[in-house]
């Protein structure tokens, strides 16, 4: 740190108190940096200074190669949340990890998140998780194209959805008559 130390900048009431801080990282390196941080904390016997290290992520269902897979998405890409006791030693430990570009706040004075700010982040995470859980790949009434099986290339309308079994009931026209057929999610694609 330059000129003043963190220990001298923080008010005495904030010393020895663990607060949430935001650390900016290189893009896509959040997991590696978190693992490196945990190793260094253990190696330097500083576990008392750190309470939690969090990469805010939520699960999303996506169709990849015709299969429904769960993927993690970052709520705040390139950021890690750390609940820590901010001292010169803990500041330097985090700051000197390769891929860490700095703390939120000024260059020499990291800014702790307020309770309302951290609560807002956790609420956003919870909302994203609920929205993702409730979101559907397909909707009743949506037009889809059959991509596999005896009805391949047929166009149909989604009539029912079974999220647990990843199956759809699709109405297709066979010889001019609407006929319902059951298909897996990976047997259809959206008609874009």
Swiss-Prot record:
One of its GO terms (biological process) is transcription elongation-coupled chromatin remodeling. Residues 140-168 form the KOW domain. GO terms for cellular component: cytosol. CDD domains: KOW_NusG, NGN_Bact_1. Gene3D superfamilies: 2.30.30.30, NusG, N-terminal domain. Pfam families: KOW, NusG. Keywords: Transcription, Transcription antitermination, Transcription regulation, Transcription termination. It comes from the Bacteria. Participates in transcription elongation, termination and antitermination. Belongs to the NusG family. This is Transcription termination/antitermination protein NusG. It comes from Rickettsia felis (strain ATCC VR-1525 / URRWXCal2) (Rickettsia azadi).
